[in-house]
């Protein structure tokens, strides 16, 4: 039976993959993965599977999210086991909701396999308990960026001294973050920790406080910022110690990346997005027509995702 799996790759260490994720990767026919999935995790994929990089690097996308959605629907008609592999957990800032909606519209069977999200990996690396009955009774997972890349800090009204804040994808917005947190009433000496490439060999950790966020530059991506009284410095202080971390190392990692480039099949660039979108609409109409035909409560005898490539520019030849 054809099936799509939305799999969380975790922070990058293959030992942190779930047993179920390892099993599915080992049986995959095709894997559509994000740019941040590490080579070590990709090595867990079956040798017979196709690897397609559909991620983005430094804001440059191979495919838009709409094109990825349509491509996912397309390959679901061609392969038995399709894996959409996402860094961290698919359901936390992984755009899984849009892909779930696209698959549901055309009746594709899918399953979600959770992964360890970056906030948990970063907290473990920095030895920070995100909750502590003495200091923090709630945790807020958020991001500094909106859809389209613009900076958004409209969540700061929810910050209290009893809140641990985990900021995904802070990018270069540390100065804005520091200023906004101070204006929201947070103590300037509230400790912070930034973890870059959490759970990977190139992992870097640095401590500062809210007042010191404005000084941060050249930090490698991916990074995660944790703010709150639960944060403890490894040197027993929350004083800014960034000079001890040799920021030039972070800058070098930002250039080389936290992962080595892989030799992928560059075919994701060759597909016509209009073809994917037309295919998705066609399959959606077929699925709705089939459901009307069989009536409520009856299961369709044939899978609605029967290969349609002959109607769309001989997609099997293009895919091969």
Show the residue positions of the predicted features.
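Short, charged, surface-exposed secondary-structure boundary motifs
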Residues: 60-67, 121-123, 145, 150-151, ...
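Short, positively charged, Ser/Thr-rich terminal linear motifs in low-complexity/disordered regions
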Residues: 270-320
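Catalytic cores of RNA-modifying enzymes
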Residues: 99-100, 104-127, 131-140
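A contiguous loop/helix-start segment that scaffolds small-molecule binding in enzyme catalytic cores
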Residues: 2-4, 77-82, 95, 138, ...
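Phosphate- and divalent-cation-binding pockets in alpha/beta enzyme and binding domains
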Residues: 40-41, 120-121, 176-177
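Class I S-adenosyl-L-methionine
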Residues: 1-14, 19-116, 212, 220, ...
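Short hydrophobic/aromatic-enriched beta-strand-loop microsegments
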Residues: 49-56, 107-111, 130-137, 185-194
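Generic beta-sheet signal
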Residues: 34, 54, 113, 142-144, ...
């Amino acid at each position: 039976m054809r099936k799509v799996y939305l799999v969380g790759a975790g922070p990058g260490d293959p030992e942190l993959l779930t047993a179920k994720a390892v099993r599915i990767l080992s049986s995959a026919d095709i894997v559509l993965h994000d740019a941040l999935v590490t080579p070590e995790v990709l090595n867990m994929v079956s040798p017979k599977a196709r690897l397609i990089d559909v991620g983005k690097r430094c804001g440059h996308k191979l495919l838009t999210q709409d094109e990825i959605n349509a491509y996912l629907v397309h390959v679901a008609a061609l392969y038995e086991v399709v894996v959409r592999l996402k860094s961290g957990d698919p359901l936390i800032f992984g755009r899984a909701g849009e892909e779930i909606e696209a698959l549901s519209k055309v009746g594709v069977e899918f399953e979600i396999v959770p992964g360890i999200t970056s906030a948990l990996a970063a907290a473990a690396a920095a030895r920070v308990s995100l909750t502590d009955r003495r200091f923090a009774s709630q945790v807020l997972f958020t991001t500094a960026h909106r859809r389209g890349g613009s900076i958004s800090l409209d969540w700061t009204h929810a910050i209290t001294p009893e809140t641990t804040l985990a900021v995904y994808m802070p990018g270069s917005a540390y100065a804005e973050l520091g200023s906004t947190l101070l204006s929201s009433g947070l103590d300037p000496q509230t400790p912070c920790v930034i973890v870059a490439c959490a759970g990977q060999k190139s992992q870097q950790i640095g401590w500062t406080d809210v007042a010191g966020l404005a000084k941060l530059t050249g930090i490698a991506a991916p990074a995660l910022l944790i703010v709150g009284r639960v944060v403890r410095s490894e040197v027993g202080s929350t004083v800014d110690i960034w000079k001890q971390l040799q920021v030039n190392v972070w800058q070098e990692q930002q250039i080389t990346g936290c992962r080595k480039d892989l030799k992928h099949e560059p075919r994701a660039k060759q597909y016509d997005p209009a073809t994917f979108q037309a295919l998705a609409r066609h399959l959606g109409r077929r699925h709705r027509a089939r459901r009307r035909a069989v009536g409520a409560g009856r299961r369709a005898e044939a899978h609605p995702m029967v290969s349609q490539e002959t109607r769309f520019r001989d997609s099997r030849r293009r895919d091969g």
